[in-house]
């Protein structure tokens, strides 16, 4: 039985990066094998989560870790841990938090579509600053007896350093939560972030190539214990964010594989892919092309930028998606950072995809007068 064929759902070409709407990443065969083995047996989920978290923490070089059903779930559970802690009575009340410390301070330029995940736990977000104007004293001015935590997002926007945030958090005895979903590579980044944070949330389904619906909370052991109490399989706010034994085992296997990977060799491969695409597009000389490195959050990830112009770039993006196979590019980068450019991310291109992308793009660019 071929379910995809039965449903009439065809594969797409992912030149956007490891994005949830496109299925995250492609699982290595070793990860699939481990998940398959786990699917045939029953396990004590408390024991599995506990031991899997310890192993992942060891591999990443952090103090403690907890596995979640994706990074967004990790934000919700982190917020719950900061609000309710290990108090069972409070845990059972979430998301009703009126009688608890329930405010989380966040810089306006760090607001994202994902910060509603904090609110799902009953948090009230207290926004500070203008998007690109910030005074450190603004954080201190918002802290009161209802403040539960401070939140930071690893992003290409904002002018507040993580170190400044952490300094304020420590001074007031508040936990600092970092949304670091896409920060790998390098694999050392979560460990480095934990030096200036109490909880760091990382996606398991992006560069790690674990299941798309997996994530990791790294951080201080006491708070990680609180995360576990507020999460599945307990009857808590995290119960609907259930993570299966297959996901847990698959994520551990993915991390085991990744820490043995030669990141520099992979980066060089990405550069070669982009250079190949760029050379094919030389036949459309009217459009400027450049490989940008590092990326917006300073990861060692190269991307190819093709300057098409604000008036035409979305026309090209939509035509790529309407073809067979559909080709998706890094639309969020066009939308948020580079409004006149189409951006190709090589990290999720499969073998042979580069030529298909280049040929289709060349055809479209020539139709625009390239």
Question: Positions of the model-derived regions?
Answer:
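Flexible, glycine/charged-enriched surface loops at secondary-structure junctions
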Residues: 45-50, 64-66, 238-242, 261-270, ...
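A common structural junction motif
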Residues: 234-235, 321-328, 363-369
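An acidic intrinsically disordered interaction segment
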Residues: 36-48, 216-217
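Active-site pocket-lining segment
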Residues: 244-307
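Conserved PLP-enzyme active-site core in the AAT-like
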Residues: 1-27, 48-259, 263, 278, ...
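Conserved C-terminal alpha-helix-loop-beta "cap" of PLP-dependent enzymes
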Residues: 3, 282-360
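A non-catalytic, amphipathic alpha-helix used as a structural packing/dimerization or gating element
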Residues: 37, 51, 55, 269-276
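Generic N-terminal amphipathic, Lys/Arg-enriched alpha-helix
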Residues: 11-21, 29-39, 299-304
């Amino acid at each position: 039985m071929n379910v995809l064929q039965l449903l009439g759902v065809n594969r797409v070409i992912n030149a956007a990066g490891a994005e949830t709407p496109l299925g995250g990443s492609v699982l290595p065969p070793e990860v699939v094998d481990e998940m398959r083995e786990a699917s045939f047996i029953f396990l004590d989920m408390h024991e599995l989560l506990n031991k899997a978290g310890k192993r992942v923490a060891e591999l990443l070089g952090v103090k403690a870790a907890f596995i979640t059903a994706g990074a967004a779930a990790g934000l919700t559970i982190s917020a719950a841990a900061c609000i309710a802690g290990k108090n069972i009575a409070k845990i059972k009340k979430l998301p009703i938090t009126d009688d608890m410390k329930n405010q989380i301070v966040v810089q306006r330029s760090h607001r994202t579509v994902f910060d509603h995940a904090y609110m799902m736990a009953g948090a009230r977000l207290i926004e500070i600053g203008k998007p690109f104007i910030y005074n450190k004293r603004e954080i201190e001015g918002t802290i009161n007896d209802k403040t539960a935590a401070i939140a930071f997002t690893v992003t290409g926007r904002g002018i507040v350093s993580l170190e400044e945030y952490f300094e304020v958090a420590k001074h007031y005895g508040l936990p600092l939560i970092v949304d670091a979903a896409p920060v790998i590579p390098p694999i050392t980044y979560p460990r480095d972030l934990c030096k200036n944070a109490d909880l760091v949330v990382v996606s398991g389904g992006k560069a790690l190539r674990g299941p798309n619906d997996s994530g990791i909370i790294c951080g201080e052991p006491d708070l990680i214990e609180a995360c576990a109490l507020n999460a599945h399989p307990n009857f808590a706010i995290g119960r609907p964010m259930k993570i299966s034994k297959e996901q847990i085992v698959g994520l551990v296997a993915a991390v085991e594989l990744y820490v043995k990977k030669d990141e520099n060799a992979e980066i060089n491969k990405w550069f070669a892919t982009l250079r190949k695409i760029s050379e094919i597009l030389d036949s459309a000389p009217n459009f400027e092309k450049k490989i940008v490195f590092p990326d917006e959050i300073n990861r060692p990830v190269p991307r190819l930028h093709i300057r098409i112009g604000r008036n035409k770039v979305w026309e090209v993006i939509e035509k790529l998606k309407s073809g067979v196979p559909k080709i998706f590019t890094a639309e969020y980068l066009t939308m948020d950072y580079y409004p006149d450019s189409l951006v190709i991310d090589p990290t999720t291109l499969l073998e042979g995809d580069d030529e298909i992308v280049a040929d289709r793009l060349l055809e479209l660019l020539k139709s625009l007068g390239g």
